[in-house]
């Protein structure tokens, strides 16, 4: 594993893009798991992939087109009064069908559809870095504001109703934040890699952490460390980044959870 490739000027921008997303997505995934909406990560990613592909078909970069589909899903979920993972399962099906149909009926071909699923991190440029940085700032600024309300809503579900609190704005705000995070993640590191970062580190953190602060640090730490290892491995072995990241996340966190359980 050649760590020098990480600081190579050719891969510096792609590395920074992925590094930001590797810290952001696990933080969003923590709250999705807390709300029992972990499938949201995959549903929003699929909608983002579909709208990103549609954007490419009309000449719009995927990283700009992807948020439109994810935001549409977040709005539909918020104002459609849907609860649980059912709506996100429908998003997966809709996004998958749209992606395959657009890929099959456009000049882009199925290769671009597969590229969106697997990720095109190595080709990330300034526009991708700017999008990732914006999402990173929104998460750093927004989560401390949204988190207390979201946690209280989960632990004390009757508090909002009994106190006549209009908490829908906080839930909708987080839905939008999660949609943006998954959209930029899907448009840069790939659909399945983005889902893995939002799902696997929080799963492990919930199993081994002592409190919420500990959970936050563990999930973000797992995401960042696994990303750095996967990035170096993928470049050194000339392998696609997305599958390598998923493999590193699953193997490392699975082993850590098993060791901790014993």
Please annotate each region the language model reported:
Residues 141-174:
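Membrane-helix/interface signature in polytopic inner-membrane proteins
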Residues 27-109, 205-217, 234-237, 260-262:
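Short loop segments and helix-boundary regions at transmembrane helix junctions
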Residues 14-17, 61-68, 85-89, 133, ...:
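Loop-to-transmembrane alpha-helix initiation sites
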Residues 194-243:
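Transmembrane alpha-helical segments in multi-pass inner-membrane proteins
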Residues 45-57, 91-103, 123-124, 167-179, ...:
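Small-residue-rich segments of transmembrane alpha-helices in multi-pass membrane proteins
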